[in-house]
């Protein structure tokens, strides 16, 4: 993802995330050097993933696919690309947090062999508070 992609990716973020990152948080993630990838169809961004790398751990910070393109392989492509890129960058593990109420996402990550490691109580605040399930994948 480059700076010119941020607006399109942020529009997807607002569309699909029940508690979206603020615009400042979204843009500052790019500015601080987090890694990011986009999925495009005919030059239109239909999905994105943002992750950080600390030593040998890759942290999936945010992923989103436009509603019209969900369940059509874009999320899988983004996740597989994140895993591959993380390996290239030297990571041995990918971890993430997911809302405990988000059964579709939990199923999706489990399908790609992520394991449930722990629960963080009251991790998500705002209008839809929720616990987070911590998941990880050895790569």
Residue locations for each model-derived region?
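Residue-level recognition of the GNAT/N-acetyltransferase active site
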Residues: 2, 66, 97-101
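Acetyl-CoA-dependent GNAT
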Residues: 3-68, 79-81, 85, 89, ...
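Glycine-rich acetyl-CoA-binding "A-motif" of GNAT/NAT acetyltransferases
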Residues: 44-47, 104, 129
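Conserved hydrophobic beta-strand within the GNAT/NAT acetyltransferase core sheet
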Residues: 60, 94-98
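Conserved acetyl-CoA-binding loop-helix of GNAT-fold acetyltransferases
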Residues: 71-86, 107-111
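Short glycine/proline-centered loop/turn elements that form peptide/ligand docking sites
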Residues: 79, 102-105, 122-127
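Terminal substrate-recognition subdomain of acyl/acetyltransferases
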Residues: 131-139
């Amino acid at each position: 993802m480059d700076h010119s992609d941020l607006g399109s990716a942020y529009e997807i973020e607002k569309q699909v995330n029940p508690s979206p990152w603020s615009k400042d948080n979204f843009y500052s993630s790019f500015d601080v050097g987090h890694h990011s990838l986009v999925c495009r169809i005919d030059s239109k961004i239909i999905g994105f993933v943002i992750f950080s790398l600390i030593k040998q751990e890759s942290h999936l910070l945010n992923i989103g696919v436009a509603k019209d393109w969900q369940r059509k392989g874009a999320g899988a492509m983004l996740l597989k690309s994140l895993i591959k890129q993380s390996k290239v960058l030297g990571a041995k593990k990918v971890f993430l947090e997911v809302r405990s109420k988000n059964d579709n996402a939990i199923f999706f990550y489990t399908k790609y062999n992520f394991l449930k490691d722990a629960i963080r109580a009251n991790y998500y605040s705002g209008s839809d508070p929720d616990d987070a399930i911590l998941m990880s994948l050895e790569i």
